[in-house]
């Protein structure tokens, strides 16, 4: 290690910054250009804000599709259409007719 001038700020020490500027190339040489390039390009770590993906615009026909859906009748509930009260009455009748228990 060479002795460093104590009057220099740490960011101005020789060898602290590369001679060439960083670029957007992802080749092996550029990935190992400096520590910043290595973490960003080599490791794929960036601490900046993530860009929001824009949603793809729906096709123009989507509005007509929505209107056709609203014209369709709503589906009826599955199961016993009379509801749960009818099944309770059936259970009460079965217990009355079966006195063995």
From Swiss-Prot:
Site (Essential for Tat translocation through the endosomal membrane): 11
Region (Cysteine-rich) location: 22-37
PTM field: Asymmetrical arginine methylation by host PRMT6 seems to diminish the transactivation capacity of Tat and affects the interaction with host CCNT1.
Binding site for Zn(2+) 1: 22, 33-34, 37
Entry keyword annotation includes S-adenosyl-L-methionine: no
Highest taxon of source: Viruses
One MF annotation (Gene Ontology) recorded for this entry: metal ion binding
Cross-link annotation Glycyl lysine isopeptide (Lys-Gly) (interchain with G-Cter in ubiquitin), location: 71
Main localization of the protein described in the UniProt heading: host cell
Biased composition (Basic residues): 48-57
Motif Nuclear localization signal, RNA-binding (TAR), and protein transduction boundaries: 49-57
Family indicated by similarity: Belongs to the lentiviruses Tat family.
Domain notes: The cell attachment site mediates the interaction with ITGAV/ITGB3 and ITGA5/ITGB1 integrins, leading to vascular cell migration and invasion. This interaction also provides endothelial cells with the adhesion signal they require to grow in response to mitogens.
Protein's name in the database: Protein Tat
Organism the protein comes from: Human immunodeficiency virus type 1 group M subtype B (isolate YU-2) (HIV-1)
